[in-house]
Structures are given as structure tokens and as C-alpha cells.
Amino acid sequence: INRKLDAMNNITIDDMKALQTENYNIKAEFAKDILLKTDESKLSADEKKYFDIYRSWNLRNDPQEKGATVFAVWWKELEKAIWSDEIDKSGLPLPWPNEATLVESLHKDSAYHFLDNINTPSKETLEDDLLASLKKITDTLKIVEANGNLEWAKFKGTKVQHLLKIPALSRLHLPIGGGNGIINATKEDHGPSWRMIVELSSPTEAWGVYPGGQSGNAGSKYYDNFIDLWAAGKYFKLWFMHEGDRLDKKIKWTMKFEKG
């Protein structure tokens, strides 16, 4: 966010809309030179295929990007290869270190202690872990691709669930990008929902949207009519009421409270 703001001048409403829906993956940017150390000569045809998809990826988690899926699956498996032998063996419910910690450590130390698998007699290196993790995920990616889900939005499967998690009353498989560690932090079922931008002009103006609707009746067209607009990064102009608006025709009813 700071990088984006530093590059902006005379920021407009459209600039802020673009910022709130920004899908650039800065974690992937910092990790790319690490993953590109993979020895391509040791890859099978299928492994090379997914490596090339990743290498040509533009580092954006846009809905149609396949490289974002390869990166997410590969990075998760690489983390497992590096951390699980030591941490899981402790027998304690310890969390793995932060992803940024791993990226920083691998940049600073190519012989990072945790690269070695303590359960094998050999001493594994970064190259070994990169190869092993990519080989391990290739079959998974082949299945994902065969099911037509290699594009990021289809793989991520963002959904807006009913409070009772009833699928028929939920909206599933939304075509939206973003993800963990991205400004648009939309994950499978969590992330930024209500988006709002307020311009402190005179008069004050505001824009907003949320993934839902204005009716709780699942049979109403207003039950979920904002969701597609939200997924597409669209906004509504909000009505910022002033004292003289109390008789405006847009007001459908009023509520008066009296002491009992």
C-alpha cells in the first residue's frame, strides 16, 4: 500500500477504487528469484510445463492467472518441506514462521539450517527442496487443470456463505482475484467485504459496495444483487444525507421513537 501511495499524485476516486481492488502479489515478487533457482535440467515435461507457467506469470493474482495457482501450491509445499520435519517433530502445536521470515532467511543464507530434512541421512539444499516440492505438486496441478480449475479465481473458489452455510442460499465460485498478503485480500471465504471511499469535498461525496443485498429474503432479487458488482470491483455512489434531505422522495419511510 505504501509503495502504491508513494507513486500517486493528485489521487482521484478512480485511483482509490483501483487501489482497493489491487491484485499485485508482492510476496511473490520477493520470492520469485528463490523459486527460479530450480534446476530445470532435472524436471520432467509436466514439471517443466508448470515451472514455465510460473516463470511467465506477471505476479498478479487476477482471476484468469494460472501462474498464481502454481505459485500458491508450490510455495505451500516448499514451506512444508522446510519447516515440517523440525516443527512437527516437536509434538507441540507450534505455528510455522511467517512467510516473510522464510523469504528473508533464504535471501540471506543459501545454506539455511532448516533446508535440511532431519529425517534423512543426506543433507538437503535449497535446490533439493525446490525440486522435491515442485515434483510433489505436479500431480496435484494436473488434476486441478483437468478439472478446469487452474485459473486463480476458479482454484481459489471465493464464496459468500449464508450464515448457516447452506450452499443453496450462498453465492459460490465468484470470479474475483486477490488473496492472502495482497491489497485485495479476498480469500476463499474471508477478506475485505465492505469497500468505501469518501471524498472530503464540499459537499462530501462517497462510494461503496458490499457483497450481499438489501433483503434477507432469498427469493428476492435484492437478496444478493450487489455481489456480482462487488466481485467486478464496481461501486455505488452513496447518498450522503444533509439536513435538507429529510423530505427527499428517495426516503420511503421514517421511524420515530418515543419513550414508553
What are these model-predicted stretches?
Residues 2-260:
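C-terminal/peripheral segments of proteins
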